[in-house]
């Protein structure tokens, strides 16, 4: 197995009902958002770091407006109660990120290149790595960054595209794996943001946020 096999499997899915579900999800990502909704997406991505997307979504929904109003201590207690693995750190990151609420939209629109915007997010938002910053950007409508999480790494291992699963992803390694996904993107005619949903489906049988 290798890149050719993965390309073929993606193309098969592209011709199935899964394509409709994925295209609908991509349209949802492109909708206009308020400043509060942008922050909510950012918090979702902070919650999913070293955690699961499903768990992050469940906790975000349970927190409600608490992401805007709770003190760091209250937020940490609530996150612990809801079962997050790193309640104190995530509470710290969320409270720290609140300062971005009034300026995040302007920061996003000031960048023409989404890769440079991703670099800015990684450097300036505590708790965001390349995976989380890419996830945030895809979820607000950007299409040319890859969300490389353990599901994607497992999939690339299964297809023999990666020889071993990296324990951690440095910037250089992240960009190297992203370049492999760019090749698959070119060959399938599917942008990176959408490709992530196809790969997630192949690995998990689900189309997630």
Curated annotation (Swiss-Prot):
The record marks 209 as: Important for guanine/8-oxoguanine distinction. It catalyses: 2'-deoxyribonucleotide-(2'-deoxyribose 5'-phosphate)-2'-deoxyribonucleotide-DNA = a 3'-end 2'-deoxyribonucleotide-(2,3-dehydro-2,3-deoxyribose 5'-phosphate)-DNA + a 5'-end 5'-phospho-2'-deoxyribonucleoside-DNA + H(+). The active site is at residues 131, 149. One of its GO terms (molecular function) is class I DNA-(apurinic or apyrimidinic site) endonuclease activity. Pfam families: Ogg-HhH (PF22175). The keyword DNA repair applies. Its EC number is 3.2.2.-, 4.2.99.18. Keywords: DNA damage, DNA repair, Glycosidase, Hydrolase, Lyase, Multifunctional enzyme. It comes from the Archaea. InterPro entries: DNA_glyclase/AP_lyase_Ogg, DNA_glycosylase, HhH-GPD_domain, HhH_base_excis_C. Catalyzes the excision of an oxidatively damaged form of guanine (7,8-dihydro-8-oxoguanine = 8-oxoG) from DNA. Also cleaves the DNA backbone at apurinic/apyrimidinic sites (AP sites). Belongs to the type-2 OGG1 family. This is 8-oxoguanine DNA glycosylase/AP lyase. It comes from Korarchaeum cryptofilum (strain OPF8). The gene is ogg.
